[in-house]
Amino acid sequence: MDIIMQKRNEVLAQNVIKGLESRNMSGYYAADREAAVKQALELIPEGSSIAMGGCTSAHEIGLIKALEDGNYNYINRAKMSPRESLMAAYDADVFLSSANAITSDGVMVNIDGNSNRVSCIAQGPKKVVFIVGMNKVCSDLDAAMKRARNVAAPANAQRFEVKTPCKTAGKCFDCKSPDTICCQFLITRYSRHKDRIHVILVND
């Protein structure tokens, strides 16, 4: 990554972290993927049960492999029914997620189809750890909503066997398709419980 952009991300991340802290959430900056994995493991005690809500970021940085290789109870939802997976996630010590977008003052936006991910972010698991790339930082809530709907959702639609306008055109049409993956919108602006929500901002 260009050194100038890296410096910009470092400065921006500190502002996001301040915003998160003002909202009773914790923020961290990781200069690369390895640092992000190290920070995540510092937040997850050995022996913890860990669930995940379709977080490709956790796979991409190598966190899931580290958990599977370590002394952790990683809940593999691919081996469970949707209902079993949801109940296990609610009861987990740690829930891993990404965010579709985050504002520069620490407000997160997430869109969900089945709603298992946003429901676990809102309540249930004792701790939620977000892995968020700096490319997801937006100037304000309006920009964050636009990113979630016009960038994140159309990209995520490519991962699933769905028939939605955004999958074929690459942008949001505010559709009501039976296959829509935009059923629930969750805006996380404050955490009722201190030390529950942790956000790792990754310079990647």
Question: What is each stretch, according to the model?
Answer:
Residues 3, 25-27, 134:
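Short, flexible active-site loop motifs that bind/organize anionic cofactors or intermediates
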Residues 90-204:
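Conserved phosphate- and dinucleotide-binding cores of soluble alpha/beta proteins
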Residues 1-9:
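Glycine- and acidic-residue-enriched helix-capping/strand-helix junction motifs
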